[in-house]
């Protein structure tokens, strides 16, 4: 979901449909899988649960790139302003974790209803964002676009190659963080796991706000 969906959805947003409309549609579709998951879950139905989560992630993962695309399109100075805008996403992430723990929803279906409801509201909100037309609308889709040739060619630049390789390596432990940290913290006797996990997101805020200062040194 994290590797393939963003590429194909990005292709649609680049050539066919306004980015804010694609973004809104993805959040609404993603909310549906979360809202129906508790209705379908039950003993012996782990495959159904995993399918619903996969469908949600197929909708969610492309939104990370699409929100960045909209931001850089409309911010007057994206390099300096984007980290300040993006940090509010992390603050929202922390708020959600605190809410889940406050409601003691970690082990109940309520967490899925909260996720689905938030995704639904966010989807409708996206339609109020500034219009961001597809930059390549009307242009034919070429074979090199399907294999992301232009993106691969950027690997010739050493700085970009280092960035991509580093990002790839960082995402390996990050996947384990998402998948297993809650079980590990529960085994350690930590209660209110969702709230405890926000400590990691708090460090993200610090480094994100430092980014404009670091860019000045480049």
Named regions from a protein language model:
Residues 5-18, 103-104, 207-218:
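Helix-to-loop junctions at the C-terminal end of transmembrane segments
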Residues 31, 96, 111-128:
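Symmetry-related core transmembrane helices of the 12-TM Major Facilitator Superfamily/SLC fold
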Residues 1-3, 159-198:
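Helix-loop boundary and gating motifs at the non-cytosolic
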Residues 1, 80-90, 110-113, 186-203:
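Loop-to-transmembrane helix entry
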């Amino acid at each position: 979901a994290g590797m393939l969906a963003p590429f194909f959805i990005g292709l649609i947003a680049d050539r066919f449909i306004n980015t804010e409309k694609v973004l809104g549609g993805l959040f609404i579709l993603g909310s549906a899988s979360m809202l129906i998951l508790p209705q379908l879950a039950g003993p012996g139905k782990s495959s159904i649960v995993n399918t619903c989560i996969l469908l949600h992630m197929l909708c969610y993962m492309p939104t990370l790139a699409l929100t960045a695309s909209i931001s850089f399109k409309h911010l007057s100075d994206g390099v300096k302003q984007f980290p300040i805008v993006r940090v509010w996403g992390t603050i929202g992430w922390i708020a959600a974790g605190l809410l889940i723990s406050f409601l003691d929803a970690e082990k109940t279906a309520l967490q899925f209803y909260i996720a689905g409801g938030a995704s639904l509201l966010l989807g409708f909100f996206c339609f109020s964002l500034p219009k961001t037309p597809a930059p390549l609308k009307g242009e034919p889709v070429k074979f090199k676009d399907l294999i992301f040739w232009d993106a691969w060619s950027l690997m010739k630049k050493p700085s970009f190659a280092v960035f991509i390789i580093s990002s790839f390596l960082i995402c390996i432990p990050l996947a384990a963080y998402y998948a297993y940290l809650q079980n590990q913290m529960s085994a350690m006797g930590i209660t209110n796991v969702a709230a405890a996990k926000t400590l990691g997101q708090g460090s993200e805020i610090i480094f994100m706000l430092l980014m404009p200062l670091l860019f000045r040194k480049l």
